[in-house]
Amino acid sequence: MKQPIILHIETSTHVCSVALSEGNTCLFTQINSEGMNHASLLSVFIAQAMEILKQNNKKLDAVAVSSGPGSYTGLRIGVSTAKGLCYGLDIPMISVSTLEIMTKQVLNSANYDSETLFCPMIDARRMEVYAAIYNANIEVLREISADIIEENSYLEYVKKNQIVFFGNGAEKCKNTIIHPNAVFIEDVHPLAENMISFGQKAFMDKNFVDVAYFEPFYLKEFQTTTPKK
């Protein structure tokens, strides 16, 4: 059975990355973390990926793009680029949650107990973050929401399980969420290479988004809530 060739685009934070995959195999990836110069970087990275396909006489089957939450500007650039490719090549588009991409990266970096929970965080403003909670199978235990962090945030989870906090929103929470079960990991940013398994599954399941109407989860659209205790 032919394995799908998918281009993955991740632009939800200051890190811009692209990956090219065939099935679950990464054929190419490029990363730049120098700042929000995503538009020009994407054009270069994508041209490099397409040249690899041309040299191997292969064609793209789909484009996967991070869906947020994240930077309004970054997401807009990534999604508009993905839409342009899908329209031009007449191929489907796949969306992947930014928080799931980050969780996949953390799970790939170390061995965790099956009971460990994972809380990726995207920085918003002041003590606000955009977060979700997943188990070790990246199954959603708590949906994405905007949270104002205080000392009892996520208490119902952290008092029962070890919970790993990470992402650019986790740094400001370290001195507020203090518990023996709370673990903080630094320097975790969503990367396109960690989208591959999600893109592959979505393609096989034909779980595509409408290219014309798809919009990512911009931070400004979230409703602020206080996490349940």
Regions found by a protein language model. Name each.
Residues 1-67:
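N-terminal beta-alpha supersecondary unit
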Residues 64-98:
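DPxDG-like acidic metal-binding loop motif
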Residues 49-53, 88, 106, 192-203:
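Stable alpha-helical structural segments in soluble proteins, enriched in small hydrophobic residues
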Residues 41-44, 80, 84, 101, ...:
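Short amphipathic alpha-helical face segments that pack within enzyme cores
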Residues 33-44, 72, 76, 80, ...:
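Residues at secondary-structure transition points
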Residues 185-217:
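Glycine-rich phosphate-binding/hydrolytic loop that grips phosphoryl groups
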Residues 2, 25, 37, 92-190, ...:
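Surface "functional belts" at beta-alpha junctions
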